[in-house]
Curated annotation (Swiss-Prot):
Record-listed E.C. numbers: 2.1.3.3
Localization of this protein: Cytoplasm
Naturally occurring in which organism (per UniProt): Clostridium botulinum (strain Langeland / NCTC 10281 / Type F)
Physiological role: Reversibly catalyzes the transfer of the carbamoyl group from carbamoyl phosphate (CP) to the N(epsilon) atom of ornithine (ORN) to produce L-citrulline.
Name assigned to this protein: Ornithine carbamoyltransferase
Predominant cellular place of this UniProt entry's protein: cytoplasm
GO cellular component, one term: cytoplasm
Reaction equations catalysed: carbamoyl phosphate + L-ornithine = L-citrulline + phosphate + H(+)
Keyword line: Arginine metabolism, Cytoplasm, Transferase
GO biological process assignments: arginine biosynthetic process via ornithine; arginine catabolic process to ornithine; citrulline biosynthetic process
Amino acid sequence: MFNLKNRNFLTLMDFTPKEINYFLDLARDLKRAKYTGTEVQRMKGKNIALIFEKASTRTRCAFEVGAKDQGAHVTYLGPTGSHIGKKESAADTARVLGRMYDGIEYRGFGQEIVETLAEYAGVPVWNGLTDEDHPTQILADFLTIREHFNKPLSEIKFAYVGDGANNMANALMIGAVKMGMDFRIVSPKEIPTDATLVAKCKEIAAETGAKVTITDNIEEGVKGCDVLYTDVWVSMGEPDSVWESKIKLLTPYRVDMNMIKMTGNPDAKFMHCLPAFHDEETAVGKEIKEKYGLSEMEVSHELFESKYSIVFDEAENRMHTIKAVMVATLGDQ
């Protein structure tokens, strides 16, 4: 057993492999308890603030449902629902909310904001996504891999394909090296992964037995992989010029049936943190089609809907793993 009471959850860098496994074991147990109707509420009477400077489906729902299941109450502060960073500093916001709430979730921009909240709040602070990291997503990903593969995480070969400079590439690399995985980032050289973070992760890999490979060679990068993972190529709000250049660079890196076959692994799985641009059924999808002539972006519709895709198991596990983080750091032991 581990006592993680009152710990912040800002990045997986802050946790040992054993502690990460504890979160995953607890998430598995909470999932079973929910399915069997035997869940015990360990956060009765707790009040949780959810600060969302960026919109969300999965993260918000996971925190709200997870908290409700465990007997806690939540207050949602949306993009226009708080003064943080506009009329009030993150430090002042933290000291106010820390007087009223037992835990605070933050989803927004710079990692330094969630770190400031954690420094001043005096209660557990959880990172629901920043520009640099997305640790709750990684717990969901690793729980999903555990469920689909009959081997430990340390034996998993994993390739992240696409934008090697985004927060998912960072977060997956941190989690993968902690757990001793063979991890590859397959991305154009023009979109480099943060060199300082790569160096730090390689240091950790030397201790855990993990491997880190950064390559622009798709065939080499995906060979033998158990999991191919991708994320959106561009973020909402980025200028058209960025969209155009990134789409041009990343189109050869679209994950499709051919790439899954390149792994040489008939049991390979496809993962994505969602939302995914795999068809024209959204306003953004239609806009991409009109501007760039693409019916699909980072993943082909065929692969997204295929037997290889486990994206909705992964999405469900956001709730079970986020619940585990809250229970471990805030729940009655």
